């Protein structure tokens, strides 16, 4: 009974976590390239 809920939570968190890491890395990359000139 708990497995479907756990699978749903994991499947919902994985894309959000990956998106958050991607956005953070992208912002850091843009900031670094902007400061580097």
Swiss-Prot record:
It is a single-pass membrane protein. It comes from the Bacteria. Signal peptide: none annotated. Pfam families: PetG. InterPro entries: Cyt_6/f_cplx_su5 (IPR003683), Cyt_6/f_cplx_su5_sf (IPR036099). GO terms for biological process: cytochrome complex assembly; photosynthesis. The chain crosses the membrane at residues 5-25. It is found in: Cellular thylakoid membrane. GO terms for molecular function: electron transporter, transferring electrons within cytochrome b6/f complex of photosystem II activity. Keywords: Electron transport, Membrane, Photosynthesis, Thylakoid, Transmembrane, Transmembrane helix, Transport. GO terms for cellular component: cytochrome b6f complex; plasma membrane-derived thylakoid membrane. The keyword Membrane applies. HAMAP family: Cytb6_f_PetG. Component of the cytochrome b6-f complex, which mediates electron transfer between photosystem II (PSII) and photosystem I (PSI), cyclic electron flow around PSI, and state transitions. PetG is required for either the stability or assembly of the cytochrome b6-f complex. Belongs to the PetG family. The 4 large subunits of the cytochrome b6-f complex are cytochrome b6, subunit IV (17 kDa polypeptide, PetD), cytochrome f and the Rieske protein, while the 4 small subunits are PetG, PetL, PetM and PetN. The complex functions as a dimer. This is Cytochrome b6-f complex subunit 5. The gene is petG.
């Amino acid at each position: 009974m708990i497995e479907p809920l756990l699978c749903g939570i994991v499947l919902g968190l994985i894309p959000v976590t990956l998106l958050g890491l991607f956005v953070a890395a992208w912002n850091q990359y843009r900031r670094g390239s902007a400061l580097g000139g």
